[in-house]
């Protein structure tokens, strides 16, 4: 008897109802109580039949327990789970609690990229009593706002081609991770604004060349662009490419904040024939960059590699990027600098907040030092060995406003890079689908049907506008503090103003 009643229990009621309606509509049509050509009734019959068959499938499949227990009805759970991020982003999250970037942070980039009003009435929405609230102190006698954008000269005594860099540049994002149109827009915007574009470890592509903007060539452990068939470093290929006048600096990637110690991954879905040809890798297969370099393995060898790249490139600035991990390892690099007399022209500190590379959850959340801790450590070590003046320090990691830049300068940076900030200027909506090749705005995809949504001419202007507005805001902050340059800024943090 219980088995006979099973179809009428609440968890099976959707399946039972679907089949009851299916037979009812079939009977009505068969007995000619309605016209056999009644389209709405026919559609209703087929809809109920589909749901009934779907329910049978749910009962016999073995992958999802919840579907076996609640046939048909459980699909509603999967639907709600699928649209949950969009519902949260558009309807439920506040202006300040969205992650990785809040609505306020995203909006300021959109507004500045479009040259729209970026002011806000009625005061701050931040909790000024919250533990760790930060601010910069202004002056009773503000300075004049600098008419010239802030720049920094990168290149030590042994550098023959020092580079005058903007203090705000595009951080490392590879062609392959980003679409061709995104690379075109970023690099052309960099050309218009006079700032640099880091290639990411994917290397220098034809789309970087099209824009004509200044290039920082990032050299990862995969050595893309100067790679031997066995995956090793090819000095001849590097020398032939590095003399390109568009390439202004060479950056050795030791690790990245999104996944330090894990290496790089470009999903096979994004490895098109074009990318495979540029990088020298198999088409359609995951492109894996080793977690460590093969051209060197010790701090002394790293210094030797820096000297070698500087010579092969004709004396261009050469440095390295890393996310700080074991402090003693970086101290070992500093010791090697002193012993060999070979110093990098720059060091880029990548905070673990970095996020344009897809990463395992544990690495994204818990591996590597955050930007501020890493930046302060590198600054102190360079000061300790007397090298801070000759080795410039760049930084990257969730830098999205001029205040973020001022904080970085206060902690020892000479310039800042931003990746996701410039992605927002291209139209990124933080859909968190970068690794799926299904980016809805055409920024992080190799699907030509999707990337065509990104109109290069329009987004080029927005990239330029965002950079220009950021530097202007930084100049205003610097002037309000009564300073001539943001590297004199001081950051203040208090547990509570009432303490």
Model-predicted segments: where are they?
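Active-site-facing alpha/beta catalytic cores
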Residues: 147-149, 153-336, 343
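Active-site or pore-adjacent capping/gating segments
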Residues: 427-490
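Glycine-rich phosphate/ribose-binding loops and adjacent secondary-structure elements
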Residues: 288-451
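An N-cap/entry alpha-helix motif that binds or orients negatively charged groups
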Residues: 74-155
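Transmembrane alpha-helices and immediately adjacent membrane-cytoplasm interface residues
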Residues: 49-62, 81
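Conserved small/polar residues in nucleotide/adenosyl-binding loops
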Residues: 492-499
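Juxtamembrane interface helix immediately N-terminal to a transmembrane segment
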Residues: 2-18
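Hydrophobic alpha-helical transmembrane segments
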Residues: 35-47
């Amino acid at each position: 008897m219980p088995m006979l009643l099973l179809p009428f229990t609440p968890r099976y009621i959707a399946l039972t109802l679907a089949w009851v309606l299916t037979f009812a509509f079939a009977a009505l049509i068969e007995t000619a109580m309605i016209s056999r050509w009644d389209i709405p009734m026919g559609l209703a019959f087929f809809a109920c039949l589909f749901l009934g068959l779907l329910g049978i499938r749910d009962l016999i499949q073995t992958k999802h327990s919840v579907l076996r227990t609640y046939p048909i009805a459980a699909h509603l759970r999967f639907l709600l789970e699928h649209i949950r991020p969009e519902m949260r982003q558009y309807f439920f999250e506040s202006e300040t609690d969205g992650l990785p970037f809040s609505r306020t942070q995203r909006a300021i980039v959109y507004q500045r990229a479009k040259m729209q009003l970026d002011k806000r009435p009625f005061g701050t929405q931040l909790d000024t009593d919250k533990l760790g609230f930060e601010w910069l102190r202004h002056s009773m006698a503000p300075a004049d706002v600098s008419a010239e954008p802030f720049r920094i000269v990168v290149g030590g005594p042994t550098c023959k081609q020092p580079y005058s860099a903007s203090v705000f540049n595009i951080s490392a994002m590879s062609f392959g991770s980003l679409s061709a149109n995104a690379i075109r827009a970023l690099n052309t915007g960099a050309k218009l604004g006079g700032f640099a574009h880091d290639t990411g470890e994917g290397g220098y592509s034809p789309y970087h060349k099209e824009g004509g903007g200044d290039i920082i060539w990032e050299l990862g452990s995969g050595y893309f662009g100067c790679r031997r068939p066995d995956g090793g470093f090819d000095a001849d290929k590097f020398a032939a490419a590095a003399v390109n006048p568009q390439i202004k600096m060479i950056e050795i990637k030791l690790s990245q904040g999104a996944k330090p110690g894990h290496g790089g991954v470009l999903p096979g879905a994004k490895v098109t024939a074009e990318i495979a040809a540029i990088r020298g890798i198999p088409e359609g297969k995951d492109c894996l960059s080793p977690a460590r370099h093969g051209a060197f393995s010790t701090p002394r060898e790293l210094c030797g590699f820096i000297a070698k790249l500087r010579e092969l490139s004709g004396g261009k600035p050469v440095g390295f990027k890393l996310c700080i991990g074991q402090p003693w390892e970086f101290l070992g690099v500093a010791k090697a600098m002193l012993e060999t007399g070979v110093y990098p022209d720059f060091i880029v500190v990548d905070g673990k907040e970095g996020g344009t590379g897809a990463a395992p959850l544990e690495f994204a959340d818990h591996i590597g030092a955050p930007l501020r801790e890493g930046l302060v450590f590198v600054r102190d070590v360079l000061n300790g060995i007397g090298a801070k003046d000759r080795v410039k320090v760049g930084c990257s990691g969730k830098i999205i406003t001029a205040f973020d830049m001022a904080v970085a300068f206060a902690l020892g940076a000479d310039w800042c890079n931003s990746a996701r900030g410039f992605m927002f200027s291209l139209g990124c909506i933080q859909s968190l689908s970068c690794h799926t090749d299904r980016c809805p705005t055409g920024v992080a995809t190799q699907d030509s049907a999707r990337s065509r949504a990104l109109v290069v001419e329009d987004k080029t202007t927005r990239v330029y506008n965002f950079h220009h507005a950021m530097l202007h805001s930084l100049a205003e902050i610097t002037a309000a503090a009564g300073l001539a340059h943001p590297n004199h800024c001081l950051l203040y943090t208090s547990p509570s103003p009432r303490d």
